[in-house]
Curated annotation (Swiss-Prot):
Annotated GO CC locations: cytosolic large ribosomal subunit
NCBIfam families assigned to the protein according to its UniProt record, in alphabetical order: L17
Protein name: Large ribosomal subunit protein bL17
PANTHER family reported in the protein's UniProt record: LARGE RIBOSOMAL SUBUNIT PROTEIN BL17M, RIBOSOMAL PROTEIN L17
Keywords: Ribonucleoprotein, Ribosomal protein
SUPFAM superfamilies membership: Prokaryotic ribosomal protein L17
GO biological process: translation
Sample GO molecular function, one term: structural constituent of ribosome
Gene3D superfamilies xref list: Ribosomal protein L17
Record has Heme as a keyword: no
Ribosomal protein is among the record's keywords: yes
Amino acid sequence: MSYRKLGRTTSQRKALLRDLATDLIINERIETTEARAKELRSVIEKMITLGKRGDLHARRQAAAFIRNEVANSETGQDALQKLFSDIAPRYQDRQGGYTRIMKLGPRRGDGAPMVIIELV
């Protein structure tokens, strides 16, 4: 099993990826470090694939991972609803490769390589 530890314990790493995945679903593009983005890419691919399946079990599996945050305050839509109703239908004919990683410069404070990860 191959994954990045990201300098965290298992629970901290899972919480970080849940937060990043929820933010990416809500905003559709976020700025983060390269290592986090590469690890997030595999998580988001799985979430969108669950969204494309669309059955009750897939919805419950995604709900267990994605945080319960409001994606659109006007409609009251949360992140899970956005994943299943807006994002997943967009990729119905695409088999994977739902994200794009674009490199930015290094972070000013510590020189960490920064990237923008966005939904294609």
